[in-house]
Amino acid sequence: MQRSPLEKASVFSKLFFSWTRPILRKGYRQRLELSDIYQIPSADSADNLSEKLEREWDRELASKKNPKLINALRRCFFWRFMFYGILLYLGEVTKAVQPLLLGRIIASYDPDNKVERSIAIYLGIGLCLLFIVRTLLLHPAIFGLHHIGMQMRIAMFSLIYKKILKLSSRVLDKISIGQLVSLLSNNLNKFDEGLALAHFVWIAPLQVTLLMGLLWELLQASAFCGLGFLIVLALVQAGLGRMMMKYRDQRAGKINERLVITSEMIENIQSVKAYCWEEAMEKMIENLRQTELKLTRKAAYVRYFNSSAFFFSGFFVVFLSVLPYALIKGIILRKIFTTISFCIVLRMAVTRQFPWAVQTWYDSLGAINKIQDFLQKQEYKTLEYNLTTTEVVMENVTAFWEEGIGELFEKAKQNNDNRKISNGDNSLFFSNLALLGAPVLKDINFKIERGQLLAVAGSTGAGKTSLLMMIMGELEPSEGKIKHSGRISFCSQFSWIMPGTIKENIIFGVSYDEYRYRSVIKACQLEEDISKFAEKDNIVLGEGGITLSGGQRARISLARAVYKDADLYLLDSPFGYLDVLTEKEIFESCVCKLMANKTRILVTSKMEHLKKADKILILHEGSSYFYGTFSELQNLRPDFSSKLMGFDSFDQFSAERRNSILTETLRRFSLEGDAAVSRNETKKQSFKQTGEIGEKRKNSILNPINSIRKFSVVQKTPLPMNGIDEEDSEEPVERRLSLVPDSEQGEAILPRSNVFNTGPTFQGRRRQSVLNLMTHSVNQGQNIHRKTAASTRKMSLAPQANLTEMDIYSRRLSQESSLEISEEINEEYLKECFCDDVENIPAVTTWNTYLRYLAVNKSLSLVLIWCLVIFLAEVAISLAVLLLLDKSPRYSKGNGTASGNGSSAVIITSTSSYYLFYIYVGVADTLLALGFFRGLPLVHTLITVSKILHHRMLHSVLRAPMSTLNMLKAGGILNRFSKDIAILDDLLPLTIFDFVQLLLIVIGAVAVVSVLQPYIFLATVPVIAAFVILRGYFLHTSQQLKQLESEGRSPIFTHLVTSLKGLWTLRAFGRQPYFETLFHKALNLHTANWFLYLSTLRWFQMRIEMIFVVFFIAVTFISILTTGEGEGTVGIILTLAMNIMGTLQWAVNSSIDVDSLMRSVSRVFKFIDMPTEEGRSTKSIKPSKDCQLSKVMIFENLHVKKDDIWPSGGQMTVKDLTARYIDSGNAILENISFSISPGQRVGLLGRTGAGKSTLLSAFLRLLNTEGDIQIDGVSWDSITLQQWRKAFGVIPQKVFIFSGTFRKNLDPYEQWSDQEIWKVADEVGLRSVIEQFPGKLDFVLVDGGYVLSHGHKQLMCLARSVLSKAKILLLDEPSAHLDPITYQIIRRTLKQAFADCTVILCEHRIEAMLECQRFLVIEENKVRQYDSIQKLLSEKSLFRQAISPSDRMKLFPRRNSSKHKSRSPITALKEETEEEVQETRL
């Protein structure tokens, strides 16, 4: 960044904002980059501002029982705030004084007033000077107030972030991420621009008092008639505002529903295309859009009336003020013009400035109170440790997650001791405690010596992570004692990657030691990965390490924990995303050898780890089920250990399967498990299979696929239970992860639409607490096409050389946390870490965009012509009035009456030509109430245009090829449907209306002035030319600065969420100061852009006003010097010229707003112009209930005989198939050729990333493909894409359940009757599940069907395939996380319902693969082998490597017995448990 010219700028340059000229010039000539932005002044740095406010807040906390944040803010900013307020007031006073001078100038043209005529020129100079003074006072004052507002926001941003890092886990459990984002964006945005309006809460009343005093002098009591009308108008506007909010609240729920479905569609677009559901999804979304648009129109109409009321009020205010006085006493002409000028100022003060100021104070004080409450939340307490302690001891420890339970426990215990109450009372006390919440850990005891390994095992929700949290001090024990040295290192269950390089992630602020670093890299198997990157370990990782695989992230997290020199290492399931061989090697080399002399606590469920541990602690429902050695486990719990050992390949199971088996075993053998379960508990568990509610609702804030929902989900049907998920959670079900009331769930939890342009946004579905965010994994299943070849680790299954035994920790490092962070952090690096893709849109909206926008709906052009016709009619009326004035005698005393002092005065009477003249002045102010006949059709039509654009964009996205969609971020696509459509619906119609309204007022006023005094037209031409040139000059830079500012917001919120995700790691490593510094750097980056935007905006506003001041000076002196005796002419010219001043500036700002908002239209057009998938029929196939063919999803084909249906057998022939993700990309699959006989089952084999799932996608033509595939003799080139895809039934790896009823999810086209759906539900074992829910098939699933287990969701997919009657079934790891029961159901259904179908299976379970007749082995993008299992096992192959010799002995007899045509019977559950899973995930 460049040094700011502001630092060396002169007073003159600062006053006129001339120091911004270099950046304006550069922005006009070329595209601005981040390096072009100026550094912020030191006074605006987040460090200084936060330190200042933090000092005052600490002082407030120390001095008072009831601290107020507003007092701390007052001590920091009050005097500057008041100084600029006084400047603002003085600027506003000049507006009140201007009409006085105008009246004197008009009076000087009275033929009998010769005295004042001589000083008219001086009065004109005085009037012009008032405009100059107002310009010099107003702009510095407004800029100063914006600047203070910015500083207040920065200081509070920083204070809140520091508080977040200190919050206790119990508090984090009750705060949703949406609430934090809202706190930082919604509330604090009010300070930035709102502060300039705050002073009008006292300025406006003073202004009104002054104006009423001056009007009283002119009109006496009748002046209050106009004021009364304005007050009534303000109240009406307030009422309309409330009505508008009511409509908008109703509409928010509808928008929410639409965006939920849209986001689910975008997340699962591949499944939507595979199922051919494009039309069904489009119809569903369009139906929701229709309901939303009805409310949008109502809100827009109310807003329109509210806005236009201001424009139309001017005539009535003057009319009501003057008429009573004129009827009673008559009135001279100059009083009319003076009154008009006063009323213009009065109208602005009463109907705009004061209501806005009150709203600003209301919002700001509300925001300050919210922040104040947040800053007083309970903080994380650092436990006291004894550094000399070498052992880790836990004695009788009990803990609760619920806030206050522990304190309650202590208090009640003290009461027990004091009062020595009886046993009966004691039991009463404990029963009361149980009502408050169940303990997450109960009576835990263990002791481990230095250098020992403690393995902690237990089923899901047993309290394993909570145990580690308690050792770290994150969870306070309610009773018991914990003892350890306090020097802790921690590896989280869900790997957390901070933005930065691999090296920085591993070192994490600890001083660098080359030998130690290399040892850790080697032990964690990272050498091969790092060597593949061009930048090695200096490669910058994006948000959440998105470019890495799950295994790479896990190993970097482990390396970070191991690198730190600590006494105690807490490893929370660190091997979850590693394949079996890598896990074994890392466990041996790292945990057992490298860390041999360190105390380690490892959370695991692997038998191999339990055998090697010095001590084992098995938890069940928060209690210690067993503590001792492995041999003691076998002796004391023989049933339990033999049961686990009975699973021959327990270690080979995935973590989810091991947890499932462990849960069942613990349930069977625990003492508590034998007790009878109450009826209520049974009912509560009825949705769960083997204790699982299902796949945990992943709060993937940092994942661009799943982090795109901006609105909370509205639950239509009340759930019969609190859906707290268990599957991956480490806390028991009793723990409530979010205590936000249900009534709040309809709120949109995100800031206004202008807060984010790009970058991450936050989902609010069933508000997740921050603690829940920390204990959920980021979705690791990133599509492989999103990773570059360099960043995808090809896992080698070959054993690597064993590390020599070493203990690198003997090399004690120098003081920790010694990383120097005061140095300047590269902003480009920050941008690379945090920011989303920069949009490729021109700096200024092109004319082509405007023309396309006009052409969207023919009615829009007609409405604009209609507006022009009305405008011409208004001008014609105006000219007719002028003609009447010209022909009437100018000072007809016959129509007047003598005033008291004998001088000739112009009196208004009903017959006077001046009455017409007066009417015209009112007409000129409002141009005959412009809008009711013009504005309403315009607003209505613009909303219709928005409707059409949304429809076209949705259609285009659904029809776009996957190669195009893969290049876009899901969050970016949803932004078009949320933010940009909201702009098209809400902001654009009213902004265009305002601009048209203001522009016509200005043109009308200029036309009138020019007709009255032709010389003024000569002054108008250069002014309009200057305005157009200046606007174009400024617009280039301002739009780029706004874009950069918008991008600058992204790092702030991304860093916030990144910090929350890794908060436990941050605290364990003590890196809070480092992350505060990073946050301040991100804030400073945004501030630099925002401050420069504010400065250039003020430069532009001041230049516009200076041009108008010059114009007004020209008009004044032309009028004074060239007009003969005609006070009416001078009056109307000067009155309109003064009115033009404010109106034209408003029109200029509106034109800039229109240009800015039209960028959203440009982005929408960009999506509408996306290419469509090749081969799609122009006439889409509409399913019909009556049509039997569409009902069974089979189509007549020209290549097949009329009597046949296609496909009939399911024979597939693949010839030279090559697949790419994008046209110019590398081939993912090359020259694949093979054939499959009808009804044959083929298994796909290959390591992770070999291309198995890619091949299935290629069959569905979801990729760019070359070559040919034929099904039953019909080539894919000869039929439409939709017909081709409907030949396949699909069970994808990523299950797609959208928000809707069971019926809609199974049959979105509504083709099948209830009986047919129930029949299929019976076949796949879903009936019992669906019948448990109220409404059965009509029960509404939300949040991706989180109330269903992963197994139930797979059964839903299976049911869809059965209903489709497809002849070819594609299965992509259907049993990845299934419990044994659901897996048996799927196997049975595949054998029965798809007995005659061709099945292509990609699977990791060996037993499942044995059902296949042939296997296709894919290596290095090509087919290596295509044979039967016997041949594959007899040769050296990947399949042979994956199966141990003992397994081969078992498998051959079974395989030989199933060679015959009749397939083997379904394996029983007992047999199923003896299977082996070959886990090859990274």
UniProtKB/Swiss-Prot annotation:
Residues 99-122, 217-222, 320-339, 881-919, 1013-1014, 1118-1131 are extracellular. CDD domains: ABC_6TM_CFTR_D1 (cd18594), ABC_6TM_CFTR_D2 (cd18600), ABCC_CFTR1 (cd03291), ABCC_CFTR2 (cd03289). Residues 1-77, 147-195, 244-298, 359-859, 941-991, 1036-1096, 1153-1482 are cytoplasmic. ATP 1 binds at residues 401, 458-465, 493. One of its GO terms (biological process) is chloride transmembrane transport. InterPro entries: AAA+_ATPase (IPR003593), ABC1_TM_dom (IPR011527), ABC1_TM_sf (IPR036640), ABC_transporter-like_ATP-bd (IPR003439), ABC_transporter-like_CS (IPR017871), ABC_transporter_C-like (IPR050173), CFTR/ABCC7 (IPR009147), CFTR1_ATP-bd_dom1 (IPR047082). Residues 654-832 are annotated as: Disordered R region. Residues 1451-1463 have a biased composition (Basic residues). It is found in: Apical cell membrane; Early endosome membrane; Cell membrane; Recycling endosome membrane. Residues 423-646, 1212-1445 form the ABC transporter domain. Residues 81-365, 860-1156 form the ABC transmembrane type-1 domain. One of its GO terms (cellular component) is early endosome. A lipid is attached at residues 524, 1397 (S-palmitoyl cysteine). Monomer; does not require oligomerization for channel activity. May form oligomers in the membrane. Interacts with SLC26A3, SLC26A6 and NHERF1. Interacts with SHANK2. Interacts with MYO6. Interacts (via C-terminus) with GOPC (via PDZ domain); this promotes CFTR internalization and thereby decreases channel activity. Interacts with SLC4A7 through NHERF1. Found in a complex with MYO5B and RAB11A. Interacts with ANO1. Interacts with SLC26A8. Interacts with AHCYL1; the interaction increases CFTR activity. Interacts with CSE1L. Epithelial ion channel that plays an important role in the regulation of epithelial ion and water transport and fluid homeostasis. Mediates the transport of chloride ions across the cell membrane. Possesses an intrinsic ATPase activity and utilizes ATP to gate its channel; the passive flow of anions through the channel is gated by cycles of ATP binding and hydrolysis by the ATP-binding domains. The ion channel is also permeable to HCO(3)(-); selectivity depends on the extracellular chloride concentration. Binds and hydrolyzes ATP via the two cytoplasmic ABC transporter nucleotide-binding domains. The two ATP-binding domains interact with each other, forming a head-to-tail dimer. Normal ATPase activity requires interaction between the two domains. The first ABC transporter nucleotide-binding domain has no ATPase activity by itself. This is Cystic fibrosis transmembrane conductance regulator.
